[in-house]
């Protein structure tokens, strides 16, 4: 299972725009070492691993507390909490899948999708659950939401750093491949014929 090709292209273009370091003139390492460099982030992968086991505990805790306080909530907050639980569950499954695929297989579009889902959707939702006192927040809820928020903040930072490394390596490889191609097939007469080529035909004509 992979992302649709149009979405992959859009995420790839977004990554090149946001994460490319324009100040970087070339690779920091020799080409052989750069080719063998592992770009996957171990801290990010460990965070995703523990997140996979933590999320069911968070879900069960949140559903249990929602059931207990449901009668005292207003209809407005009842609707919001049920909607948030459904959306958070769906987003988290997709988010963790993209994180695993993007980090382990060094796929930029998948990791960019993971980063965007974490930053723009999941983190704001968890902060809403953590700080909105109208939800009648219980101690267990606050505890699991704080842990979840810490996971998300760390993953946003770690994924950002990893994406910058991946995109810059891809950009470096692209420029090196272009340079090698020009060396193998040099573009001659780029600015017109050289002086020697202009002089030789004139000399070969001789006097009339």
Swiss-Prot record:
Pfam families: Transmemb_17 (PF09799)
TM spans (from-to): 46-66, 79-99, 111-131, 143-163
Membrane topology (UniProt): Multi-pass membrane protein
Entry GO terms, CC: ciliary membrane; ciliary transition zone; MKS complex
Keyword Cell inner membrane among UniProt keywords: no
Cellular localization per UniProt: Cell projection, Cilium membrane
GO-annotated biological processes: cilium assembly; non-motile cilium assembly; smoothened signaling pathway
Keyword list, A-Z: Cell membrane, Cell projection, Cilium, Cilium biogenesis/degradation, Membrane, Transmembrane, Transmembrane helix
InterPro entries linked to this entry: Uncharacterised_TM-17
Function as written in the Swiss-Prot or TrEMBL entry: Transmembrane component of the tectonic-like complex, a complex localized at the transition zone of primary cilia and acting as a barrier that prevents diffusion of transmembrane proteins between the cilia and plasma membranes. Required for ciliogenesis and sonic hedgehog/SHH signaling.
Family: Belongs to the TMEM17 family.
Subunit architecture: Part of the tectonic-like complex (also named B9 complex).
Protein name: Transmembrane protein 17
